[in-house]
Amino acid sequence: MLSILKKLFGTANDRTVKKLFSEITKINSFEPAIKILSDAALKNKTVEFKEKLKNGATLDDILYEAFAVVREAASRVCGMRHFDVQLIGGIILHRGMIAEMRTGEGKTLVATLPAYLNALTEKGVHVVTVNDYLALRDSASMGKIYNFLGLSVGCIVAGMTDEAKRIAYNSDITHATNNELGFDYLRDNMKYSMQERVLRPFNFAIIDEVDSILIDEARTPIVISGPVNDNSALYGKIDKIVRLLNVSDFEKDEKLKTINLTEAGITHIESLLIKDGIIKPDTGLYDFENLNLVHYVNQALRAHHMFTIDVDYLVREGKVMIIDEFTGRVMEGRRYSEGLHQALEAKENVKIQNENQTLASITFQNYFRNYPKLAGMTGTSMTEASELKDIYNLDVVAVPTHNKVTRIDLDDEIYGSKQEKYDAILKLIKDCYNRGQPILVGTISIEKSEELSSILNKEKIPHKVLNAKFHEQEAFIIAQAGRFKAVTIATNMAGRGTDIMLGGNPEMLIEQFNKDHNYVAKTAEIKAQIAEEKQKVIETGGLFVIGTERHESRRIDNQLRGRSGRQGDPGKTQFFLSLDDDLMRIFASDRISGVLRTLGLKDGEAIHHPMISRSLEKAQQKVEEYNYEMRKNLLRFDDVMNDQRKIIYEQRTEIIKSKDSYGFLTSATEELAKKIVLTFIPVGSYREDWDIENLTVELHRIFSIKFDHNLVNKNDVTEEDITKLVIQMAHDIYKSKEEAYSSELMHNAVKYILLTTLDQVWKDHLYSLDHLRQGISLRAYAQKDPLSEYKREAFNLFEQMLNNLKELFIQTVYHFHIDLKHLQKEDISLEHKKLQKNMRESREDPAFSKYNAGNSIETYLKPVVSRVDPKDRKPDDPMSWGRVSRNELCPCGSGKKYKYCHGVNE
């Protein structure tokens, strides 16, 4: 019934596209007048558009003419004229939606339309892609169009200086990778002045390969971290013990990707831990004193039994490097968190790096939701349309192809074993190779690609392997995969973003030559050779794409198919499967095995059965739904941290921009003074219950105030009077510092102290949240909702952090002095300039710079409280104690350590 209605009325997508086609005539109506403009007049259109916007016009008012201008500029500069369907894609992107466009339909060119239009507001446009190569390529090729029209173009890649990044981000249009954007956002919020920041306020982002970034990478947060305690030896010891466990000692669930010790396993590992002296005899792994070891054991179990070398990670130059499960690329600089990376290093017997503590983190889900306007392009996203709508409020519109798709998608072939499957794949590859038909073989891991490569080597079939180990060459290899007799093996979607042209890519081949006197002749020769080769490839049937396994996601399978049949080219695709494949084994093996037994399948015989196809599709849908729930759950938890992150980052920016840091100090001083006084002199309490002695100690500890007991001996003194007095005394201390050092220098010092304190407590708070998050799922066993519990406890931790911030900030401000002796006769204003300079230098990008203590503000800020000879301390006068180490006996004579007595609140 539904299919009949769709035929009668069309789908919602059909109706949207039909409506958009009616707008194309408006763009085309400008073409005759724009075509006759000179280059200078065409460029001047940018000035005209900006003037119109300043006079009240909207972007939609100038959309049709602006798109016509970009089309004409592209035609003149690059020799490429936007097709009507590409104009539709541009409108979709401008309106904050996702354009699904098939491979080879020119998504890069489409992005120039909304990028140019939105750049006219002078607020910046980010064109986001998945790797440095694509960012550089697209900024260079499309930048010619923008420059021709008078707009500036920047490109952000790894390893750039802050100054270079600042220039690139201040360009009208900036090409960048999602990773660099995320890290720059975190780094900016660790800087100490607005001038040091590189990013502008968020405006509009166009994400290429949007499904890869917003879906595939959504579960992986980007993290800036710093080292914590060295526990490498313990990881090594636990690794050796876990190797001795039996299969019966643990249970693993491959569907849920979990692993747990059995009762027998707990007993076994406890005996091994006792034998190695790691835990005491007669204690258990889950005893309170040994609970920290559970974390190490669990990560070692995961490393050995849930993670596979050359599938999930590889070892290169003595380092464990993560492989992106979706692209097959090495994720440079990324490390698994929570000790898993250290467990893998112990497993592979390479140097174990220190665990890291999170300094700043954000998921791509929450990073990209910062943009007021967001759009994206991809070849396959309709299968995830509901997720993109639910999480990002992005509608997906499938754009029709310019040429009809002539590719033939053959039915899957299913075999009983992996060997039978490989035999069938080899037979097909031989047939295609002998006829000259190019073949692209897609695998799901490096291990599988190298396994297949080994088979082809034995058969002496020349081929190229494209995987994470050779990602530097991937664009060139994939671009030439359409040549006559080419055989290419690729992991998943490695090389994504680079078109496979039948006969080869002439531009990339031409780039291999130096521009010598034979350059023009060589160029013509290569183009002629490619044209001839293309015709031969078309005669063989075009590119044949072979899938060696079904991926968990239908979308990834569709992306592999989409490598063939670009722009109306001929091509074929087919998947070869076996019951040994991970997806079949985990999700569909029992049902399909039953069908095969019923049908009496013989060795080496393939089967095509509708039930098997349905079972596979159901298995993929099941995994997709599970992964979607995982991402949704991650977002629910990350939203809690994101709300707190926004508050901290906004507050930090406000502090940096502030020209009066004394305002922050005054409000914090008043609030803390009231709190301290009320702690020792509760409202409505009797005078004899007032704890003046400890109030005196606390006021000195926090404010450096020498409080006179006699001030409260008057009968008419109230706690309110004492609070006012404390605030006034604190104010006087600050003013005396201002007189000594100048108000300008004090302003900078207070601002610096506030920012460093904020950074410290925020870092500690993230550490607490990490630990809270790790164990929160256990609350479900107590019939409590883990998310509700996480929200409640995270809020309590946040309040506690803010209280700690105020106290540490106040304590530091009132207990420091600035050492100006080294200045000799230099002016205070010069000291202020030096202080500002050192403040900048002391807090450069923590990901790249080496901290230079000699250039930090700590050179100038020194605590007033100094050590005092113990014999000069009076037990009943804390003022005489000076600085006391926390582990010293308390000078009061109680016999307790200072940290458990008068120092309990420090």
Swiss-Prot record:
Monomer and homodimer. Part of the essential Sec protein translocation apparatus which comprises SecA, SecYEG and auxiliary proteins SecDF-YajC and YidC. Its cofactor is Zn(2+). This is Protein translocase subunit SecA. PROSITE patterns: SECA, SECA_MOTOR_DEAD. Belongs to the SecA family. It is a peripheral membrane protein. It is an enzyme of class 7 (translocase). Part of the Sec protein translocase complex. Interacts with the SecYEG preprotein conducting channel. Has a central role in coupling the hydrolysis of ATP to the transfer of proteins into and across the cell membrane, serving both as a receptor for the preprotein-SecB complex and as an ATP-driven molecular motor driving the stepwise translocation of polypeptide chains across the membrane. Its EC number is 7.4.2.8. Zn(2+) binds at residues 890, 892, 901-902. It comes from the Bacteria. It comes from Rickettsia prowazekii (strain Madrid E). The lineage of its organism: Bacteria, Pseudomonadati, Pseudomonadota, Alphaproteobacteria, Rickettsiales. GO terms for cellular component: cell envelope Sec protein transport complex; cytosol; plasma membrane. ATP binds at residues 86, 104-108, 499. It is found in: Cell inner membrane; Cytoplasm. Keywords: ATP-binding, Cell inner membrane, Cell membrane, Cytoplasm, Membrane, Metal-binding, Nucleotide-binding, Protein transport, Translocase, Translocation, Transport, Zinc. One of its GO terms (molecular function) is ATP binding. It catalyses: ATP + H2O + cellular proteinSide 1 = ADP + phosphate + cellular proteinSide 2. May bind 1 zinc ion per subunit. GO terms for biological process: intracellular protein transmembrane transport; protein import; protein targeting; protein transport by the Sec complex. The gene is secA. Disulfide bonds: none annotated.
